[in-house]
Amino acid sequence: MRGLNLFQLILALLLSMVAAEDGYDGWLRYAPVSCDLHCQQALPSHVVLLNSTKGSPIETAGRELKAGFQSILSTNLTSRPFQCNSSASILVATLDEYRQRCRDINVPELDPDGFWLQSEGDTVRILGKDARGALYGAYEYLAMVAQRNFSRVAYATSPHAPIRWVNQWDNMDGSIERGYGGASIFFKDGTVVEDMAPVEQYARLLASIRINAIVVNNVNANATLLLPENMKGLSRIADACRPYGVQIGISLNFASPEALGGLNTYDPLDPGVIAWWQNITDSLYTYVPDMAGYLVKADSEGQPGPDTYNRTLSQGANLFARALQPYGGVLMYRAFVYDDNLNESDWKADRAKAAVEYFKDLDGQFEENVVIQIKYGPIDFQVREPTSPLFANLYHTNTAIELEVSQEYLGQQCHLVYLPPLWKTVLDFDLRVDHKPSMVRDIISGQRFNRTLGGWAAVVNVGTNRTWLGSHLAMSNLYAYGRLAWSPTDESEQILEDWTRLTFGQNHHVINTISDMSMTSWPAYENYTGNLGIQTLTDILYTHYGPNPATQDNNGWGQWTRADHDSVGMDRTIWNGTGYTGQYPEEVARVYESLESTPDDLVLWFHHVPWTHRLHSGVTVIQHFYNAHYAGAEAAHGFVRQWESLEGLIDRERYEAMRSRLVYQAGHSIVWRDAINNFYYNMTGIPDVAGRVGHHPWRIEAESMGLDGYQTYTVSPFEAASNTTAIITTSNSTTGTARTSIKAPSGVYDIGVNYYDLYGGQSKWTLSVGDKVVGQWLGDMEHNSLGHTPSIYLGGHSATRITFHGVGIRQGDQLKIVGEANGVEPAPLDYIVLLPPGLVD
């Protein structure tokens, strides 16, 4: 007994010595869990593989099981020749092979990729409908073991839909459009990279969440991918992914016959064009015999398409679909088609109507291997949108939902935003087609309209950063996407808790803290960026990152708010607006047509109302804006305190990396809060009843300080500076000093400095109080892997804050900041804030 206690003590000490990790293994860390001798003896000690050929998913399953048991339990699983009744073994096989070799087994009907998992102590059977399903079952069992779940189970599970793909927007030069985790793992300098190790690891992660295909290149495709040398490169990518049951697909440029093939047309009905594409497809399948198919973006945002020749979208899609049919390939055709030169003066103009207008009348005209890939909302991955009505308008056409793991409009992985609760607002939405239950999840699976093909696509955009997405916590979104694509009725919080256990361990405080932070994160981000259905009030013209609400209007992009001095919101009603509500089935349209029945969180999406309109909550629209933005920023600051409570419970490398992002998010949430509130206060003249907006008693505006070598600078947009003005050095190669006498009472304060970190320079600042240097820092965010879209301008994208905690000051002390310009960055400063510890200004 005493020996066992000593063993447990040593094991606990070893487990407490948290080793440094960089995130490369994601949720497949296979971290050790406690398992005493009795526990070990109750688990399998052998692995048995049936029909395991070299490079097959079943061989991969055996390798993963061995590696997992060794790492998790320090158990060496030995291979054993196949026997039907192997004891103390994990048996992995396809169901058909097992039935041929052994007795029949009572297993429920499985769909392709499905599996049966039976665990009875030291005997485990994993039977897949196919080899890929068997691999999925192995990962399922390993996930149980990694979470110290040794319970007896016996169940079958099949995928919600056959298509469970990820999209990468990787360019041939190695950049990634809307990617925030480093350069491409697939391409560099116009060709496919040599090193396939990251590709294999990515495929491994995807297989573990049951993703079955990757589209490896940008939807804004470069035709040079179709050159013979790049086809050879695609073959190497496919070879790296194949052992994990992950197929590859590619995006196509519609004009390739002209751009690459030397034809004078890309008309989809031209016989020469048809022959050219068939030849290209034949060649691709020579290099990649199991290629999943194509993804096409056409007639959208400058991309060529069939409309050039007055052909329909279905005629364009069918060109590729027919070329793929002999090989069983799928054509994913994006529904993201709209006019980006709309006339805002036309009250009826509405980009949100475009998808239904373009596709509804073509229903039933697409080939059976065409799937229309529909964004979850009718605009573009906003913080909240209503469900795209196109899902309700295609009875005779296969559909898939398009989600975005990459946080293009949602903080670009620099802000914690756990996305499944957002996705579930669409997946669980009942469109009531023909007055019958019509959940979006049942439409994309094919169940509602009796379609055999359909499913899921997500824009992921992993890169060479060891965290894959740039942020450790952002990986929860990729994990959850795979889980939901398999089983969309799973609860967001349960998925999150499973991911946390696999990624950060079994500590209950860690699990509860990360769960609470993450489940709060989307509402918080919505609060401080754009609420009531107004969309994300970011800069839609360039970065899609920082606040810039003015860019929503006065252009042809159609993401309008129609905000003015008196009122705000898009009137999308039938009776007085764009008629968008009429694209929904009758029961849904009736809800959104009425201001009284429209939920508050979408009121500005569907209705144009006075700023003084009272919501169902009883609060006016403008006051809701003010309140929500303050609440959101307060929540973001809470994330830092919550994360800091995990110090010592998470390895130092991941703890510090994530803490720095959360600190940044807290500061940037203040930038967002003030920019949006100041913009609309300036527009409406309606004050905040709580007296917060425009009143910051703890701040010292930089332009009010004594300046030497600094000059004032009027920031544009004005709301991106606390008092519309910042200071910059008089040249880009000089030093400036700003000083002031502290008027605050003596005491201990947190000193925050809001400044601008521009791309293309690394200014240096030194903060002093009295005769003591408080701290120094560099404007080097472009080099410290923060990863968001950079900016060379003073604005909401480059604005940020650094805080020095627990600084003792005396009233009358001189506060001084010395800024040394570098490159294009003139050491810009906005304001200093002196806060009693724990207060959010």
From Swiss-Prot:
Keyword Glycoprotein attached: yes
Catalytic activity: an alpha-D-glucuronoside + H2O = D-glucuronate + an alcohol
Cellular component aspect of the GO annotation: extracellular region
Location of this chain's protein in the cell: Secreted
Signal sequence, start to end: 1-20
Keyword DNA-binding carried by entry: no
Coiled-coil region: none
GO BP term (any one): xylan catabolic process
Family annotation (InterPro entries): A-glucoronidase_C_sf, Glyco_hydro_67_aGlcAse, Glyco_hydro_67_aGlcAse_N, Glyco_hydro_67_C, Glyco_hydro_67_cat, Glycoside_hydrolase_SF, Hex-like_dom2
Keywords: Carbohydrate metabolism, Glycoprotein, Glycosidase, Hydrolase, Polysaccharide degradation, Secreted, Signal, Xylan degradation
Residues of this chain annotated as glycosylated in UniProt: 51, 76, 85, 149, 222, 279, 310, 343, 450, 465, 527, 576, 682, 723, 732
EC number, as in UniProt: 3.2.1.139
Family matches, as CDD domains: CBM6-CBM35-CBM36_like (cd02795)
Single Gene Ontology MF annotation: alpha-glucuronidase activity
Stated family: Belongs to the glycosyl hydrolase 67 family.
Function: Alpha-glucuronidase involved in the hydrolysis of xylan, a major structural heterogeneous polysaccharide found in plant biomass representing the second most abundant polysaccharide in the biosphere, after cellulose. Releases 4-O-methylglucuronic acid from xylan.
Protein name: Probable alpha-glucuronidase A
Lineage, uppermost ranks: Eukaryota, Fungi, Dikarya, Ascomycota, Pezizomycotina
Record gene name: aguA
